From Swiss-Prot:
Cited function: Alpha-conotoxins act on postsynaptic membranes, they bind to the nicotinic acetylcholine receptors (nAChR) and thus inhibit them.
Domain of life: Eukaryota
Domain characteristics, as noted in the entry: The cysteine framework is I (CC-C-C). Alpha4/3 pattern.
Species whose genome carries this gene: Conus regius
Alphabetically ordered keywords of this record: Acetylcholine receptor inhibiting toxin, Amidation, Disulfide bond, Hydroxylation, Ion channel impairing toxin, Neurotoxin, Postsynaptic neurotoxin, Secreted, Toxin
4-hydroxyproline, modified sites: 6
Entry protein name: Alpha-conotoxin-like Reg1e
Localisation per UniProt entry: Secreted
UniProt keyword Secreted present: yes
Signal peptide extent: none
Sequence similarity: Belongs to the conotoxin A superfamily.
Disulfides per UniProt: 2-8, 3-12
């Protein structure tokens, strides 16, 4: 998921 990706984590 997004929350595990450092590039996308900010969206969580």
């Amino acid at each position: 998921g997004c929350c595990s990706d450092p590039r996308c984590r900010y969206r969580c």
